[in-house]
């Protein structure tokens, strides 16, 4: 898609009245899609470009705001989707907007046969960066990630939401070259859920025999057991991801089974059978302390986020590290949807993760729906294990770094 040509009828009088930054932040779509020049538009401002990712939600496109000349991400979901979730995700983004580490949402509306959500364009995911760093992160990098993500998850929880989709593909750095290129962002709220009832203002009830929701590799033990998720489960899944980064892999990866149901069972059984001390062996005691704490939380209990953050900030300081955002990937070339760029080393130490307004140049990429090479259910293990629905994930480039993926069978995402 040639972005240098004008968008024809896309620049309407109504469009010119829209905010140049957001371009029409409305849940009611203005007449969109094709123009006389054959250019596909979302709303009056956003031109749709090349595909940069796909999944069971639909597909992700690179876009451009014709008024600001800035790139955006456009998430498309078929209007006739059997399990529509994009409008709910848009609502959750609106609830969470205006804080650091959450991409800004610009627009929601129809685009031909699709519903479209326009968001900021971000840089690579932590999974992409993990690959770039030979699949191991140093303690310093993991602690800088962990301190930020505890803060992100705390913020999500303060907005009455639980996330339920922890995996490295859903945490992205800012777009290289922007002010917040070193901040870790949380994306993809398609599986998020309100844990505080909006009418009664009470915590959702404890339930059992629930379908699996999330990614099997990282999900909590209680999720494997079919228990309703709450705040504790998001934090436990983060702990599993932190150990994945430190170890390079987890003991329950690569397990073989005849059916997906059996495989999920094996993963859950192995998690329960792996003592925390063994999982965290040869790593600082704080990693084990974190997991012991979150696994002991009650379903209704509010986690002590300050305690968990302090565990890691104290370890960080004792180790003599400086919170300078000099991650393991600093200085390496980072492929992005708009070309390869080199990350700059931070010019000076910055303050630890503080809530600030977004830089309007930041961005969103979602690898939701992509498959990890050794985990054919990654990103899809939310489907009821008793009724798997197979879909074909087409050969597609990975959203952030354009790594080729082969065709694989995956589970249909369900609400």
UniProtKB/Swiss-Prot annotation:
- Set out the biological process GO terms recorded for this chain's protein: endocytosis; positive regulation of canonical Wnt signaling pathway; protein phosphorylation; signal transduction; sphingolipid biosynthetic process; Wnt signaling pathway
Keyword hit for Cell membrane: no
> Which residue positions are annotated as catalytic?
165
**Broad class of the protein's primary localization:** cytoplasm
Please list which residues make up the signal peptide: none
Q: Where is the Protein kinase domain?
A: 46-316
Q: Which InterPro entries match?
A: Casein_kinase-1_gamma_C, CK1_Ser-Thr_kinase, Kinase-like_dom_sf, Prot_kinase_dom, Protein_kinase_ATP_BS, Ser/Thr_kinase_AS
Which SUPFAM superfamilies does the record cross-reference, listed alphabetically? Answer: Protein kinase-like (PK-like) (SSF56112)
Task: Give a single Pfam family match.
Answer: Pkinase
Q: Reaction catalysed by this chain?
A: L-seryl-[protein] + ATP = O-phospho-L-seryl-[protein] + ADP + H(+); L-threonyl-[protein] + ATP = O-phospho-L-threonyl-[protein] + ADP + H(+)
Task: List the molecular function annotations (GO) for this entry.
Answer: ATP binding; protein serine kinase activity; protein serine/threonine kinase activity
Provide ranges: composition bias, Basic and acidic residues: 1-17
Q: Known post-translational modifications?
A: Autophosphorylated. Phosphorylated by aPKC which promotes dissociation from the cell cortex.
Which portions of the sequence form the region Phospho-regulated basic and hydrophobic (PRBH) motif? 369-415
Cellular component annotations (GO), alphabetically ordered: cell cortex; cytoplasm; cytosol; membrane; nucleus; plasma membrane
Q: Where in the cell is it found?
A: Cytoplasm, Cell cortex; Cytoplasm
Assembly: Monomer. Interacts with MTA1 (short isoform) in the cytoplasm. Interacts with SMAD3. Interacts with DUOXA2.
**What role does this protein play?**
Serine/threonine-protein kinase. Casein kinases are operationally defined by their preferential utilization of acidic proteins such as caseins as substrates. It can phosphorylate a large number of proteins. Participates in Wnt signaling. Phosphorylates COL4A3BP/CERT, MTA1 and SMAD3. SMAD3 phosphorylation promotes its ligand-dependent ubiquitination and subsequent proteasome degradation, thus inhibiting SMAD3-mediated TGF-beta responses.
- What is the protein's name according to its record? Casein kinase I isoform gamma-2
**Organism the protein comes from:** Homo sapiens
The organism's lineage is: Eukaryota, Metazoa, Chordata, Craniata, Vertebrata
What gene name does this entry carry? CSNK1G2
């Amino acid at each position: 898609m040639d972005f240098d040509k004008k968008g024809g009828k896309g620049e309407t009088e109504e469009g010119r009245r829209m905010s140049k930054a957001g371009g029409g932040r409305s849940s009611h779509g203005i007449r969109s899609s094709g123009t006389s020049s054959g250019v596909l538009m979302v709303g009056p401002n956003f031109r749709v470009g090349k595909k940069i990712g796909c999944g069971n939600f639909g597909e992700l496109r690179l876009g451009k705001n014709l008024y600001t000349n800035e790139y955006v991400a456009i998430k498309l979901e078929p209007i006739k989707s059997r399990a529509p979730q994009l409008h709910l995700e848009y609502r959750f983004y609106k609830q969470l907007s205006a804080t650091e580490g959450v991409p800004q949402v610009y627009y929601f509306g129809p685009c031909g046969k699709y519903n479209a959500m326009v968001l900021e364009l971000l840089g690579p995911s932590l999974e992409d960066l993990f690959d770039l760093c030979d699949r191991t992160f140093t303690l310093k990098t993991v602690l800088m990630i962990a301190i930020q993500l505890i803060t992100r998850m705390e913020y999500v929880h303060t907005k009455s939401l639980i996330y339920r989709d922890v995996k490295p593909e859903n945490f992205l750095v800012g777009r290289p070259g922007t002010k917040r290129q070193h901040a870790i962002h949380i994306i993809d709220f398609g599986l998020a859920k309100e844990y505080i009832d909006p009418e009664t203002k009470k915590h959702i009830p404890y339930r059992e025999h629930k379908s699996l929701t999330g990614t099997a590799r990282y999900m909590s033990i209680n999720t494997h057991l079919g228990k309703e998720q709450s705040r504790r489960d998001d934090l436990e899944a983060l702990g599993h991801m932190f150990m994945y980064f430190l170890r390079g892999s987890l003991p329950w990866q690569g397990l073989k089974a005849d059916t997906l149901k059996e495989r999920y069972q094996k993963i859950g059984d192995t998690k329960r059978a792996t003592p925390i001390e063994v999982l965290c062996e040869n790593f600082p005691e704080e990693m084990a302390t974190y997991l012991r704490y979150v696994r002991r939380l009650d379903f209704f209990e509010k986690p002590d986020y300050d305690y968990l953050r302090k565990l890691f900030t104290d370890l960080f300081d004792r180790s003599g590290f400086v919170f300078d955002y000099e991650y393991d990937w600093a200085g390496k070339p980072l492929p992005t949807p708009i070309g390869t760029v080199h990350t700059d080393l931070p010019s000076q130490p910055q303050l630890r993760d503080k809530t600030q307004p977004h830089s309007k140049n930041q961005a969103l990429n979602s690898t939701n729906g992509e498959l990890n090479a050794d985990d054919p259910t990654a990103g899809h293990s939310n489907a009821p294990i008793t009724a798997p629905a197979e879909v074909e994930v087409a050969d597609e480039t990975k959203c952030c770094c354009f790594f080729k993926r082969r065709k694989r069978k995956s589970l249909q995402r369900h609400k």
